[in-house]
Swiss-Prot record:
Belongs to the TRAFAC class translation factor GTPase superfamily. Classic translation factor GTPase family. LepA subfamily. GO terms for cellular component: plasma membrane. InterPro entries: EF-4, EFG_III/V, EFG_V-like, EFTu-like_2, G_TR_CS, LepA_C_sf, LepA_CTD, LepA_IV. The keyword Cell inner membrane applies. It comes from Brucella abortus (strain 2308). Coiled coil: none annotated. Signal peptide: none annotated. It is a peripheral membrane protein. Required for accurate and efficient protein synthesis under certain stress conditions. May act as a fidelity factor of the translation reaction, by catalyzing a one-codon backward translocation of tRNAs on improperly translocated ribosomes. Back-translocation proceeds from a post-translocation (POST) complex to a pre-translocation (PRE) complex, thus giving elongation factor G a second chance to translocate the tRNAs correctly. Binds to ribosomes in a GTP-dependent manner. GO terms for molecular function: GTP binding; GTPase activity; guanosine tetraphosphate binding; ribosome binding; translation elongation factor activity. This is Elongation factor 4. SMART domains: EFG_C.
Length: 602
């Protein structure tokens, strides 16, 4: 079934969220007859419910399209649909490494957005040929000429012959297919008789077939019955089936050079298949290994605890299942005095955290509490050693720490001019350092250096509310810098609550401590004794609120009578309250944790 190399095109679609990339993929599949009308549904490549609901792509998907071009030749087009969100940039990087060209989809009414830039630069770094596609051309607000000029000014690629389409109505889709055939290059190199060399693009778990591995063959032929070897891990597996997605799974006899397809080989766990690894034949291995791309490193950490302690084992099982499909999600067990048993989890960013939490709650029917998200700090100890700190509650004694370094990001924000002042003020409040400000038509593009710690809480939400949803934001990690950071503990009735401790910059500690104490005062119910809520840095209290005691009227039964009798009862009540305060436990309701942790700087 191997196709001649010059008739294969491997391409991906690069776009900002909501610019219509999955809809364009739907139209391409429909036009090339990948699915008939009955099987067609919107966003056919977004297979998770959560992807459809939020209108975002999380897992990169692939599909093989057969197209008869206007020149009468038959072509095989391998499309990889990539996510647009910054958290899933590693999905984008592996998709781009398997292609030679990209379609850059830009909304003709909105123009270039921050994540368009991030992903298109990745494509340029991979030496991709880029075809510009202007989508939503049917909207009254569409300004194709302005957007073309913007693409040339901001990205620096020629957009004069951009394909103008409407993915929704199907207008111009044929022109996109012709542009793919005529402008994008065919796969390079590839010798059918050379030893097998293939790149592992992705892998996911299927309950019937085990692990399905998506591969891009570079040299040699991959077919059923071969014993393959993963060059990175040295593991060997017999190939059980080879096939392609149309987007239905279709088995084929073999996969030749330049082709994209899947294999199953009785692999039990996704962790055994490292993305970017080189696959070769065990009997006749290849000499040179492909330069794999770097695995995704977790950036944001938080604790996940079941609301009901009895669900702990279910949560462990659910996380194991999610880990099968998402190698970038990591977790380890932890215990908290306030919340019981749970897990410390690592994520690629806040959207990733939200999606994992939502999938756990939805697919496995679990009720969860998440602790405050934190980033990875580096501690330089006085004895010359270095440590990584994932959980503020585990911070060693301040005396042993020489300095603390925190991760900084380079953030690119694109916004209409009207909101520029408010956004710059927000970045300044978050300790941002302005690097650059340029204008592209009526939109401003600002570049800031920001501490990641200030972004993980609610920066994105605040940015969207300040700009009424018009600003777009993209970031990448730049480096670690020393900061004046302190651990803030929250004490309830003079007992520290580990789930609420956090590392904050000294300048913001008092403000955040006061806000958290005020919030907890509203959320913790009154007890029979007075409860102090304090925010402390080391031994110093920086904020305090007091929940007053419930008062039982102990003198109600004294009808008139001697005042000393009343005083005796009141004194007795006072004594027992004092004792209660000493030994009584404050019950902090689960809702209080959830609400307090949702709190930003508002």
């Amino acid at each position: 079934m191997s196709t001649p190399l010059d008739h294969i095109r491997n391409f991906s679609i690069v776009a900002h969220i909501d610019h219509g990339k999955s809809t364009l993929a739907d139209r391409l599949i429909q036009l090339t007859g990948g699915l008939d009308t009955r099987e067609m549904k919107d966003q056919v490549l977004d297979s998770m419910d959560i992807e459809r609901e939020r209108g975002i792509t999380i897992k990169a998907q692939t599909v093989r399209l057969s197209y008869k071009a206007k020149n009468g030749e038959d072509y095989v087009l391998n499309l990889i649909d990539t996510p647009g969100h910054v958290d899933f940039a590693y999905e984008v990087s592996r998709s781009l490494a398997a292609c030679e060209g990209s379609l850059l989809v830009v909304d003709a009414s909105q123009g270039v957005e921050a994540q368009t830039l991030a992903n298109v630069y990745q494509a340029i770094d991979n030496n991709h040929e880029i075809v510009v596609v202007l989508n939503k051309i049917d909207l009254p607000a569409a300004e194709p000429e302005r957007v073309k000029q913007q693409i040339e000014e901001v990205i620096g690629i020629d957009a004069s012959d951009a394909v103008e389409i409407s993915a929704k109505t199907g207008l111009g889709i044929e022109d996109v297919l012709e542009a793919i055939v005529n402008k994008l290059p065919a796969p390079k190199e590839g010798d059918r008789n050379a030893p097998l060399k293939a790149m592992l693009v992705d892998s996911w778990y299927d309950s019937y077939l085990g692990v399905i591995v998506l591969v891009r063959v570079i040299d040699g032929v991959l077919k059923k019955g071969q014993t393959i070897r993963m060059m990175g891990t040295g593991a060997k597996y017999p190939v059980e089936r080879t096939g392609v997605f149309t987007p239905k799974m279709v088995q084929v006899d073999d996969l030749g050079p330049g082709e994209l397809g899947f294999i199953t080989a009785s692999i039990k766990e996704v962790a055994d298949t490292r993305v970017g690894d080189t696959i070769t034949e065990d009997r006749r291995p290849t000499e040179n290994i492909l330069s794999g791309f770097k695995p995704a490193q977790p950036v944001v950490f938080c604790g996940l605890f079941p609301v009901d302690a009895a669900d702990f084992e279910d949560l462990r099982g659910a996380m194991g299942k999610l880990r099968l499909n998402d190698a970038s999600f990591s977790f380890e067990m932890e215990t908290s005095a306030a919340l019981g048993f749970g897990f410390r989890c690592g994520f690629l960013g806040l959207l990733h955290l939200e999606i994992i939490q939502e999938r756990l709650e939805r697919e496995f029917n679990l009720d969860l509490i998440t602790t405050a998200p934190s980033v990875v700090y580096r501690l330089n100890m006085t004895d010359g050693t270095h440590k990584e700190l994932h959980n503020p509650a585990d911070m060693p004694d301040v005396v042993k720490i020489a300095s603390i370094e925190e991760p900084w990001i380079k953030a690119t924000i694109m916004t209409p001019d009207d909101y520029l002042g408010a956004i710059m003020k927000l970045c300044q409040e978050r300790r941002g350092i302005q690097i650059d400000l340029t204008y592209v038509g009526p939109r401003a593009m600002i570049t800031y250096d920001l501490p990641l710690n200030e972004v993980v809480f609610d920066f994105y939400d605040r940015l969207k509310s300040i700009s009424k949803g018009y600003a777009s934001f993209d970031y990448n990690l730049s480096d670690y810098r020393e900061g004046d950071l302190v651990k803030m503990s929250i004490l309830v009735n003079e007992e520290p609550v580990d789930a609420l401790s956090m590392l904050v910059h000294r300048s913001a500690a008092e403000k955040r401590g006061r806000a958290l104490c005020e919030k907890l005062k509203e959320l913790i119910p009154q007890h029979m004794f007075k409860i102090p809520i304090q925010a402390a840095i080391g031994g110093r209290i920086v904020a305090r609120e007091t929940i007053s005691a419930l008062r039982k009227d102990v003198t109600a039964k004294c009808y008139g009578g001697d005042v000393t009798r009343k005083r005796k009862l009141l004194e007795k009540q006072k004594e027992s309250k004092k004792r209660m305060r000493q030994f009584g436990k404050v019950e902090i309701p689960q809702e209080a944790f959830i609400q307090a942790l949702k709190m930003g700087d508002d």
